[in-house]
Design a protein with these regions (language model features):
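Leucine-biased recognition of intrinsically disordered, low-complexity hydrophobic segments
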Residues: 5-8, 36
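Negatively charged
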Residues: 31-248
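C-terminal motif of bacterial Sec signal peptides marking the signal peptidase cleavage site
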Residues: 25-28
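Sec-dependent N-terminal signal peptides
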Residues: 18-20
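Hydrophobic alpha-helical signal peptides and transmembrane signal-/tail-anchor segments
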Residues: 3-5, 100
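Positively charged n-region of N-terminal signal peptides that target proteins for export
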Residues: 9-16
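Residue-level signal for mature regions of secreted extracellular proteins and peptides
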Residues: 22-23, 240
């Protein structure tokens, strides 16, 4: 009997020891395994937006710094630095911090570079940005114009421009005076623009010789009658003009 008890005692202790060793090894390995498999990806100051086109910056990106993305260097700019970069013919810019793009390319008759990747989500004024930029005819249909209030003179005498901007968000715009004044090539469908906040459209299509798109669906409840020179010397017929004072 004593021999049997000793046998049971010895084997039970062995089994208990094996169980304790297994638990101990499992606990001690877990932190190491977690350390090896858990990593934190670094956040780069600039990045490609989900649309696959726009270059954007995080808040911690430094104005004036250059950052490389997909093999291209982009300079981060704001309102106080963008003009100098344009003057130096640098358009590889990250414009997330820019609010004012007024007259950026005014009278630059040779400018015709791709800037569709610019982040314009914070821009509030584009007044005369392409005024007399007679060579410019690049796709900028991707621009986020949802914050823009002033588009006056935007394509004033931009005689080559004829790109699709029909999907622009113009819901915040109040001023479109002279927007396509003598933009002699422009003839794109912009009939779906939200013009419900626009209060000024004088000379908007003055001498826009090619333009004859249907604008009868525009909401122009803030403008009671046809503004002076709205479509003077253009080919826009009366029956497809906005119905002034109404919001269809």
């Amino acid at each position: 009997i004593i021999s049997i008890l000793n046998y049971l005692k010895t084997n039970t202790m062995k089994k208990l020891l094996l169980v304790l060793l297994f638990i101990s090894s499992t606990v001690s390995c877990s932190p190491d395994e977690e350390t090896l498999t858990t990593t934190t990806e670094p956040i780069f100051p600039i990045y490609l937006d989900s649309n696959g086109i726009t270059i954007k910056a995080y808040d911690f990106a430094l104005v004036g710094n250059e950052y490389e993305l997909n093999g291209v260097s982009y300079t981060v700019v704001d309102d106080s630095t963008i003009d100098a970069q344009i003057a130096n013919a640098n358009v590889n810019l990250c414009t997330t911090f820019v609010n004012n793009m007024s007259e950026l390319f005014k009278d630059n008759s040779s400018f015709n570079s791709d800037i569709n990747f610019w982040d314009t989500s914070s821009v509030t004024t584009m007044n005369s940005i392409f005024e007399n930029a007679t060579a410019f005819n690049q796709d900028i249909g991707n621009w986020d114009t949802s914050s823009v209030t002033d588009m006056a003179g935007m394509f004033y005498e931009a005689s080559s421009f004829n790109q699709d901007i029909g999907n622009w968000n113009t819901s915040s715009v109040t001023d479109m005076v002279g927007m396509f004044y003598e933009a002699s090539s422009f003839n794109q469908d912009i009939g779906s623009w939200d013009t419900s906040k626009v209060t000024s459209m004088e000379r908007m299509f003055w001498a826009a010789e090619a333009f004859n798109q249907d604008l009868s669906g525009w909401c122009v409840s803030n403008i009671s009658s046809e503004p002076a020179g709205f479509a003077t010397s253009s080919t826009l017929p009366n029956f497809i003009k906005p119905v002034w004072g109404t919001c269809p």
